């Protein structure tokens, strides 16, 4: 037997032996040891736990409705700053997603040494913080994470009402939001992230079409007569736009749930980075092209589809984004379903219909808030500055620093520093930089600018706005 064959055999054997009992149980539950046609079809469409499934889930979740609001951010920042912040926050987000994955693996390894059984239990971020750092960190993680996911779901619902209006203005945006709120309630029927295999694949295809449709259409359309590119105009717009981009690459609030759905969670480490690199190939060309074509007009249109010419290609983009909104709503809301199941004591129940019925109350407040604050675009920045900053940037960095603060913890860490960081000291320095940067620029300046802009939207359109930024004045109030 050749050297390559021996290496392959050793690697294969090592991977098989490294499965925990929980992962073996999951393989049996998913039918991965059953080779019948029914089981194979189920595996292909429904049961996803590979690295590729995780990549599709991360990329699909990351590039949702923000694709339509990034041109608005470019009209606040300008092209140079817009591209710079996308690359910068994309890399920063990939780093903190890596930290979250390290903390998850560390938590799970410690708990399994204590013979804790996670069968029929989905591990969540606040539980990782509780196990590694105690109840106060659990409370912080729970508060920020759940609040962010709540508003993340609200944003997806607002996007549904905003998008469908550009196909049919028979109803105002508020009415469409109410209708789609009822439709999004069907996401209670998806058990976990494990079951988003085909949906993540289709969702990413939908956003890929929309991104390139926006890019090509804007370039073919050319510059509007008299178009102006005056961004950045003032500090409020500048930091609002920057914070929306921070929000764009802060979609890893569901990282732990996606990892837990994997058969080999330890392989997640670089998944988010590669998903971010793909997302950048969609967001940078589309936002740049649309801003180049329409310029400052985007300041009055949070949804880029409002300015693109109405034709069958735009209608297809709207329909595809609507379908993707359902998927992304499920991504944001499913962790909240898990939390609610745990609160009322049905999370480990083998009767899924009972769990699905128990999830319904979670959608009600989301539905209501989407009607109160329909500010598509500005709400992203507000959520980014006040919630995403802590949930997916500051807390993971601080938690990683505290978890491995002792020499003993560092020596016994499941995941050592990556090759790009030569030592633990380098990891600590970079984590400290992320915390300071995000707190000062994201929470401080971003929070100030986003709040000013959000209050301006309320004063201009009012809460419960019937048709936010509609061209038809009869729908505005």
Region spans (language model):
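Membrane-interfacial loop- and helix-cap regions that link adjacent transmembrane helices
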Residues: 46-47, 102-145, 149, 154-176, ...
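Central hydrophobic cores of alpha-helical transmembrane segments in multi-pass inner-membrane proteins
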Residues: 65, 90-102, 181-189
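Helix-loop interface residues and adjacent transmembrane-helix termini in multi-pass membrane transporters
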Residues: 67, 76-80, 190, 262-265, ...
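Extracellular loop-to-transmembrane helix junctions
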Residues: 71-115, 119
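Hydrophobic alpha-helical transmembrane segments
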Residues: 73, 186-191, 368-374
